UniProtKB/Swiss-Prot annotation:
InterPro entries: FA_desaturase_dom, Fatty_acid_desaturase. It is a multi-pass membrane protein. Its EC number is 1.14.19.-. The chain crosses the membrane at residues 79-99, 101-121, 235-255, 260-280. HPO-19 and T05H4.4 are cytochrome b5 reductases required for PUFA desaturation in Caenorhabditis elegans. HPO-19 knockdown or mutation alters FAT-1 desaturase activity. Although FAT-1 lacks a cytochrome b5 domain, its N-terminal contains a DUF3474 domain that may possess some oxidoreductase activity for electron transfer, obviating the need for an extra cytochrome b5 enzyme, but still requiring cytochrome b5 reductase HPO-19/T05H4.4 to become activated. This is Omega-3 fatty acid desaturase fat-1. It comes from Caenorhabditis elegans. Belongs to the fatty acid desaturase type 1 family.
Length: 402
């Protein structure tokens, strides 16, 4: 049984840095009485022990206050640092190409890593953790996102929904959670295509932003992602910025061939890093996904996984890999405070270390192989109990181990 603290989630607590959707959800949870998450269980054979989930306020108290402070100078330094790294890589391109196709591949990998690092700085902007001025955040966010052909305002909208409803089976649109019923309804070609190791890369970038499989196109102002006219205007503004950057790249390249090989291909490697990192932050054998009656903000965030990639990648990508759990509880914490904030989160979750809701962290030097393997293995979700889902293969392995 999982019960929420009698405090509930304070409606005034900075659940995700002031996101309206989460504040509203928190207000509802404040009224909830403790409940048995295994009520009406379909498959459970034993009753789980009673577990008291911490409140958001408990996490906030455990994190040093200065972790919530934004330093504009430091934020700009990281922005300049990432642009400088990408510029240096372009100047160093002839040295890489000296080694032929292998050198070109290595160059693209570096471009993908540093492109994703720039994306993380823009990601701070859309959360409001770049500076105290949201207008400045939005301006800088476009500077960071547009060269990456990532429309800033639409990303801001869809990403806030992901944070507000993490691991909610219906409302978390950051990932397409495929259920058994979805799998059965799929055409055979799609069931064949999904397990292909690189299918995640092919599906999510740039097809995801262009066509929007689960939450609507990020470029089309009349897609299902946008409700208000102001959002549609923002979509157009961000889309124009992306197209302007792509045109500037074409002008500099001098030909469509050069534009493809030296702008679009490295852009696709950025997309690969984006897919790998975001996928592994939330997809794992142990992760649970919840239906509406079983979901809560804290419960969903505890399924997030910190992964240490090593080789300097975590520092280069601003610790969005190994500080992601803290980021999900408080997304207004700047990336340069995430590791310190993580220590506070770990202390709060320590009493739950032997449960499904403990702090989840892995050292994954094999992150690329793990991404490919999970994309093949973790095909669809089935009910673990009523309202609680896990991947089919996870439950089958548990059943065989008994």
């Amino acid at each position: 049984m999982v019960a929420h603290s009698s405090e509930g989630l304070s409606a005034t607590a900075p659940v995700t840095g002031g996101d309206v959707l989460v504040d509203a959800r928190a207000s509802l949870e404040e009224k909830e009485a403790p409940r048995d998450v295994n009520a009406n269980t379909k498959q459970a054979t034993t009753e789980e022990p009673r577990i008291q989930l911490p409140t958001v306020d408990a996490f906030r108290r455990a994190i040093p206050a200065h972790c919530f402070e934004r330093d504009l100078v430091k934020s700009i330094r990281y922005l300049v640092q990432d642009f400088a790294a990408l510029t240096i890589l372009y100047f160093a391109l002839p040295a890489f190409e000296y080694f032929g196709l292998f050198g070109y591949l290595v160059w693209n990998i570096f471009m993908g890593v540093f492109g994703f690092a720039l994306f993380v700085v823009g990601h701070d902007c859309l959360h409001g953790s770049f500076s105290d001025n949201q207008n400045l955040n939005d301006f800088i966010g476009h500077i960071a996102f547009s060269p990456l052909f990532s429309p800033y305002f639409p990303w801001q909208k869809s990403h806030k929904l992901h944070h507000a409803f993490t691991n909610h089976i219906d409302k978390d649109h950051g990932h397409v959670w495929i259920q058994d019923k979805d799998w059965e309804a799929m055409p055979s070609w799609k069931r064949w295509f999904n397990p292909i190791p690189f299918s995640g890369w092919l599906k999510w970038f740039p097809v995801y932003t262009l066509f929007g499989f689960c939450d609507g196109s990020h470029f089309w102002p009349y897609s299902s992602l946008f409700v208000r006219n102001s959002e549609r205007v923002q979509c157009v503004i961000s889309g124009i910025c992306c197209c302007v950057c792509a045109y500037i790249a074409l002008t500099i390249a001098g030909s469509y061939s050069n534009w493809f090989w030296y702008y679009w291909v490295p852009l696709s490697f950025f997309g690969l890093m984006l897919v790998i990192v975001t996928y592994l932050q939330h997809v794992d054998d142990v992760a649970e996904v919840y239906e509406a009656d079983e979901w809560s903000f804290v419960r969903g965030q505890t399924q997030t996984i910190d992964r240490y990639y090593g080789l300097g990648l975590d520092t280069t990508m601003h610790h969005i890999t190994d500080g992601h759990v803290a980021h999900h509880f408080f997304n207004k914490i700047p990336h340069y405070h995430l590791i310190e904030a993580t220590e506070g989160v770990k202390k709060v979750l320590e009493p739950l270390s032997d449960t499904q809701y403990g702090y989840k962290s892995q050292v994954n030097y094999d992150f690329f192989a793990r991404f490919l393997w999970f994309n093949y293995k973790l095909d669809y979700l089935v009910h673990k109990t009523a309202g609680i889902m896990q991947f089919r293969t996870t439950l089958e392995e548990k059943a065989k181990a008994k």
